[in-house]
Regions:
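Short, charged phosphate-coordinating catalytic segments
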Residues: 110, 166-194, 298
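C-terminal secondary-structure termini that scaffold catalytic or DNA-interacting sites
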Residues: 1-12, 330-339
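Catalytic-site neighborhood detector that most strongly recognizes the C-terminal catalytic loop/helix
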Residues: 304-329
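C-terminal catalytic core of tyrosine-transesterase DNA break-rejoin enzymes
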Residues: 164, 268, 283-307, 314
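N-terminal core-binding DNA-recognition domain of tyrosine recombinases/integrases
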Residues: 28-44, 48-134
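Basic, Lys/Arg- and aromatic-enriched nucleic-acid-binding interface segment
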Residues: 141-173
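Active-site/catalytic core of tyrosine-dependent DNA strand-transfer enzymes
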Residues: 219-274
Length: 339
């Protein structure tokens, strides 16, 4: 079954056209300044968050200029967001951060126009306790191997190739669609010839406009057989439709696959599993799987391209009871000797 998150649209072109033009002008200046170093998706999210807020100001706060909005009015907006729009903690935190960044921008660049203005967001709005909005899916090894087998038997070769890349590399949703045939070389092996290393870097999530460029590591035996089988079918589709490009994943007409293509595969996987499935759970799976079989955390962090152990802790779903604790042998020996 699909994961469900409440979503209520509060903006449209007609309402946006009525928003205080000074607020729109400030927003556009903010986005231009941020676009120098922020990724396109970050800019898109900034714009979305600000427009939702400005439409609320239009409807409930007399279309005030942003610099005139009081602390209680910011608080009222976030109350409305949680009670009426049913925002979760992640959306709440992101929008709060957006409004705070926007305030800092005005304070820094428009101090001559609004000399009395100060960023009051952090003081006016308390953080929302983090909560799990969606049921977390923890895949077992048996489920993953069965998925690959089942969809191979169904001749869903592209779906299987995508899934094997997702669980074999731990790459994110957007990153998986950036993989191309020219960065996969079956002879470019590392770490005892167990992992394929991409021949070039790909754009991963990062704070800068260009993201973080990293080479990706893929467990060869999980991915390569399914990749090679899909390439045969892919070539047939490309020739039939007269298309030429090197992206691994494609639509039925040979065009480059989009997020909607992947989401359709996720629906098929969910129906077979009879439980929620989303691309990110494959990232949890590979980290947990490697941890369970005893791979050192330092190597896992290197494979994932992380800069700290904190991300490892987030994605490792092993409970304390699942892990092997060598120190327990010392306790057992002590009990055997002392009792």
């Amino acid at each position: 079954m699909p994961r469900k998150t409440f979503k209520k649209l509060t903006t449209n072109d007609e309402l946006i056209s009525k928003v205080n033009p000074k607020n729109i002008s400030l927003m556009e200046g903010f986005l231009r300044e941020k676009s120098i170093r922020c990724a396109e998706l970050t800019i898109k999210n900034y714009r979305s968050d600000l427009l939702v807020f400005f439409v609320w100001v239009l409807e409930f706060c007399e279309n005030k200029l942003f610099t005139d909005i009081r602390k209680i009015e910011f608080s009222n907006f976030f109350s409305y967001a949680t009670e009426t729009m049913q925002w979760g903690s992640a959306k709440f935190a992101r929008t709060k951060s957006t409004l705070s960044s926007f305030s800092n921008f005005i304070e820094k660049f428009y101090d001559d126009v609004y000399p009395e203005f100060r960023n009051i967001i952090l003081r006016a709005v308390d953080s929302m306790p983090k909560e799990l909005r969606r049921e977390k899916t923890i895949l077992t090894e048996e489920q993953v191997w069965d998925l690959l087998r089942h969809f191979s038997e169904k001749k869903e070769y592209q779906l299987v190739c995508w899934l094997s890349l997702a669980i074999g590399s731990g790459a994110r949703f957007a990153e998986l669609l950036r993989f191309t045939t020219d960065i996969i070389d079956e002879n470019n092996l590392v770490f005892n010839d167990i992992f394929l290393e991409t021949t070039q870097t790909i754009k991963t999530k990062g704070r800068t406009k260009s993201g973080k460029m990293l080479k990706k590591y893929i467990i060869k035996d999980i991915f390569l057989p399914h990749y090679e089988r899909w390439l045969i079918e892919r070539q047939k589709i490309m020739l039939k439709n007269g298309k030429e490009h090197n992206f691994i994943f494609i639509k039925k007409n040979g065009d480059i696959a989009k997020g909607s293509t992947v989401r359709s595969w996720c629906v098929k996987i969910e129906k077979y599993l009879e439980m929620p499935f989303y691309p990110h759970c494959s990232r949890h799976f590979i980290v947990t799987y490697l941890s369970r079989i005893g791979i050192n955390a330092d190597l896992i962090i290197e494979l994932m391209g992380w800069s700290s152990v904190e991300m490892y802790k987030i994605y490792n779903d092993l409970s304390a009871k699942d892990r092997e604790w060598k120190d327990l042998d010392k306790l057992k020996d002590s009990l055997d000797n002392d009792i």
